[in-house]
Amino acid sequence: FDAYCDHLLVRDAEGRLILADALTRASEEKPELVIDMATLTGAARVAVGPDLPALFARRDETAEALLRAGKINDDPCWRLPLHEAYGEWLKSDIADTNNAHANAFAGASVAALFLDKFVGKDIDWAHFDTFAWRPAGKPGRPKGGDALGLRAAWHMLRERFG
C-alpha cells in the first residue's frame, strides 16, 4: 500500500477515502481480524432497511459468527455480497482505482469492494455499512441513534478472542 492512487470519481463518496487510510494503517499491524463500522452508503440502508446493518465479510466463518452473535443479542445483521465481478466497476483509466462507480447498481457492495483493496490480503476482515439511526422506537431500541451491529461484533469478539 506504499503508493496507491485513487481517482475521486464521486465527490459524495469521499468518506471512504478516510476509512481506506484507516484500514491501511490497521493492516500495517498485521492483526488477525479487522472489523470496521461506518455509515458508508445510502444503498445499504435502502437494501436492508432501518433494523439491519449490511454486513460484508471476506470469510464465511466470520460472517456466520457475526450473524449468529446478532441473533443471540437481538442485534441482527444481513450479509451482502463482496461480488468480485463488481470490482470491474472501480477500474480507472487514470489511477489505480476509482472511489466509486458511475452506475446505480450494487452501491453498498461496490463500496465494500473499494475498502477491501486497503486491507491486507491475509487479514480476516468484516465491514458493517450502518446508518445507525432508528426512525421509530421499539422495546430496547429507542428512536434515534442506534449502535447497529455493535452488540453482534462485541459478542463475536468475546467468543473468538476470550
Positions of the model-derived regions?
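A generic structural signal for tightly packed, nonpolar segments enriched in small/aliphatic residues
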Residues: F1-G162
